[in-house]
Swiss-Prot record:
UniProt cross-references to Pfam families, sorted A to Z: Herpes_UL47
Protein name: Tegument protein UL47
Domain of life: Viruses
Compartments (UniProt record): Virion tegument; Host nucleus; Host cytoplasm
Gene Ontology CC: one annotated term: host cell nucleus
Leftover remarks: Expressed in late in the infection.
Stated family: Belongs to the alphaherpesvirinae HHV-1 UL47 family.
Free-text domain note: The nuclear export signal is CRM1-dependent.
Length: 696
């Protein structure tokens, strides 16, 4: 009987219902059975409607080669009293609101009143799922939102927005109204414009002014350069030395500068080359793309969340796959709003990416749209600084990774660096997942202004987003679980790369906390009038930051895969649910971000290296170019991060070695081009390398 026939027979059978523990050491994520509709592939088929039998066959083939998993006891850190006392509220200053038309304001205030009263009379199924924000706030006992001191310095230094509107540089007709093709015929133009008033989003500062400000980095010493606005020639050409310094807490300055040059060519320079020099598109079109992409991401977030939490779909799986679905569903942040409350999101299936050429450009280059000064200039003060800071720190992190990881010098990667990269991936996956949930709820609220669903009131609660980053206890728990235990603190203190990666995670934490709080403030309350333009800017800034977060996450995936599969390192470990969580995020965010597989990433890096004439070597530079750069200032910035969690429950699951889950990691996070390299490792033959064959 065919695989499809077996799947039909299984759909007719019923599964046993258990109450599983979400953190069993023998999680079915680790055990990949053979066959078509069982285990991981059966689960993915149910959640994503995967109907390609070739995926199932590949999964069975890879599962037969996979070594038995190693079971590890989960290590839990205990927050100290000092860290808890340091978790204090530090929120961006409030800005003045734009007055709204009187009729629209009155309608919004009445809708807000209905939402507030709905919290007590509606069944709880809000932004945080079954958790009531009032109960969460009662357990917080103090703010867990601890902004980066470097970010606060930059925010305090930032001047106010220009008092008068700034003219667009795009020429006549440069302020298009919001258009979302996937909602065509279901939402009128005025309704969509009320939800996303692009015609009111004039530049808050001049693009040239924002370009100059992006080159300033308060508190950053020489060697850790801020993100520029064009390619620069600070790095030496020729050999790029990847040997680790005698003190792993520092970088060779020359190699770091070369890594920063490579990072700029694969991120900011690539997007600016496509937008400014080739496509000749405009920041206003980029904002139109963001609105369309964010609505599609919201639809996909709702679809994925619904499939994760629909009990009826368990009948299509065997017991093992149904167990996996239940375990992950109990931990995921994707909590869909009821279909009746969001008919515009729930009317169809998953939303594909926009097919236009401009959209393809905006999705490319590792999510680097926020490196465009003209786009950042359209954001308000706090959101603009948040996007700029996230872009700067993720750029520095990308440069630092490319100064330590390269297919031509795999053996130079230190175990401590590979181990910490896995922990960073854990946190990035949780941050991305929670951001997708936030966008799904917020877009649902803006497209359905008369709905009284409690989730819509949750995302407008200032107190919730002042107390927790993204208003989520799960984000705080994941950050502390991955970066707050004794092992993680030791890894941070003994590696310069780890300090830079930790600072990048902290920057994304700070930026997302800032823009989501800004949205809650813009929604108004009894003391403040609603500001739809400011709220729309906060949503767009969140989309920009999420796109760059995904680009950094793909970079980390490429480095983890390189160390584990090409270098044979056993150091990289991830949470049990991290590959599955990140795969769900990548599915949902396809309209916003074109993912980069490890093979594609290293091919782009190799092309950039050839462009600037760099050749990797496993040696160390000699005097007089053997000077070092110390990122110790970032360790000082990280003193209060991560904040203490609300409880000791695991969000990530038991840690597993990446080499022990080869098949799952490849199927979920890597392209088909890596299959040959993985099979070579399993069979004991010499691997050909994830980035293509090595140079002779």
């Amino acid at each position: 009987m065919s695989v499809r026939g077996h799947a039909v027979r299984r759909r007719r059978a019923s599964t046993r219902s258990h109450a599983p523990s979400a953190h069993r050491a023998d999680s079915p994520v680790e055990d990949e059975p053979e066959g078509g509709g069982v285990g991981l592939m059966g689960y993915l088929r149910a959640v994503f409607n995967v109907d390609d039998d070739s995926e199932v066959e590949a999964a069975g083939e890879m599962a037969s080669e996979e070594p038995p998993p190693r079971r590890r006891r989960e290590a839990r850190g205990h927050p100290g009293s000092r860290r808890a006392s340091e978790a204090r509220a530090a929120a961006p200053p409030r800005r003045a609101s734009f007055p709204r038309p009187r009729s629209v304001t009155a309608r919004s205030q009445s809708v807000r009143g209905r939402r507030d009263s709905a919290i007590t009379r509606a069944p709880r199924g809000g932004y945080l799922g079954p958790m009531d924000p009032r109960d969460v706030l009662g357990r917080v006992g103090g703010s867990r939102v601890v902004p980066s001191p470097l970010f606060l310095d930059e925010l305090n230094y930032e001047e106010d927005d220009y008092p008068a509107a700034v003219a667009h540089d795009d020429g006549p007709g440069a302020r298009p109204s919001a258009t979302v093709e996937i909602l065509a015929g279901r939402v009128s133009g005025p309704e969509l414009q009320a939800a996303f008033p692009l015609d009111r989003l004039t530049p808050r500062v001049a693009a040239w002014d924002e370009s100059v400000r992006s080159a300033l980095a308060l508190g950053h010493p020489a060697g850790f350069y801020p993100c520029p606005d064009s390619a620069f020639g600070l790095s030496r050409v020729g050999v790029m030395h990847f040997a680790s310094p005698a003190d792993p807490k520092v970088f060779f300055r020359q190699t770091l500068q070369q890594g920063e040059a490579l990072a700029w060519y694969v991120t900011g320079d690539a997007i600016l080359d496509l937008t400014d020099r080739r496509a000749k598109t405009s920041p206003s079109r980029a904002m139109g793309f963001l609105v369309d992409a964010i609505v599609r991401v919201a639809i996909n977030g709702w679809v994925c969340g619904t499939r994760l939490h629909t009990e009826g779909r368990g009948s299509e799986l065997d017991d093992r796959a149904a167990e996996l679905r239940r375990q992950f569903a109990s931990l995921t942040a994707l909590r869909p709003v009821g279909a009746a409350a969001v008919p515009l999101l729930s009317a169809g299936g998953a939303a594909p990416p926009h097919p236009g050429p401009d959209a393809a450009v905006f999705r490319s280059s590792l999510g680097s749209l926020l490196y465009w000064p003209g786009v950042r200039a359209l954001l308000g003060r706090d959101c603009r600084v948040a996007a700029r800071y996230a872009g700067r720190m993720t750029y520095i992190a990308t440069g630092a990774l490319l100064a330590r990881f390269n297919p031509g010098a795999v053996k130079c990667v230190l175990p401590r660096e590979a181990a910490f990269a896995g922990r960073v991936l854990d946190v990035l996956a949780v941050l991305a997942e929670q951001t997708v949930q936030w966008l799904s709820v917020v877009v649902g609220a803006r497209l359905h202004p008369h709905s009284a669903h409690p989730a819509f009131a949750d995302v407008e609660q200032e107190a919730l987003f002042r107390a927790l980053p993204l208003g989520s206890p799960g984000v705080v728990a994941a950050e502390h679980e991955a970066l707050g235990d004794t092992a993680a603190r030791r890894l941070l203190a003994t590696s310069g790369l780890n300090a830079v990666l930790g600072a990048a995670v902290y920057a994304l934490h700070t930026a997302l906390a800032t823009v989501t709080l800004k949205y809650a403030l813009a929604c108004g309350d009894a003391r403040r009038r609603r500001d739809d333009a400011a709220a729309a800017r906060a949503v767009l800034a969140t989309g920009l930051i999420l796109q760059r977060l995904l680009g950094l996450a793909d970079t980390v995936v490429a480095c983890v895969a390189l160390a584990a599969f090409d270098g044979g390192s056993t150091a990289p470990e991830v949470g049990t649910y991290t590959p599955l969580r990140y795969a769900c995020v990548l599915r949902a965010t396809q309209p916003l971000y074109a993912r980069t597989t490890p093979a594609k990433f290293w091919a782009d890096v190799r092309a950039a290296a050839e462009h600037v004439d760099l050749r990797p070597a496993s040696s160390a530079p000699r005097a007089p170019v053997s000077g070092t750069a110390d990122p110790a200032f970032l360790l000082e910035d990280l003193a209060a991060f991560p904040p203490a969690p609300l409880n000791s429950e695991s969000v990530l699951g038991p840690r597993v070695r990446v080499v022990d889950i080869m098949a799952q990691f490849r199927k979920l996070l890597m392209g088909d081009e890596e299959t040959a390299a993985l099979r070579a490792h399993v069979s004991g033959r010499r691997a050909t390398g994830l980035g293509g064959p090595p140079r002779p």
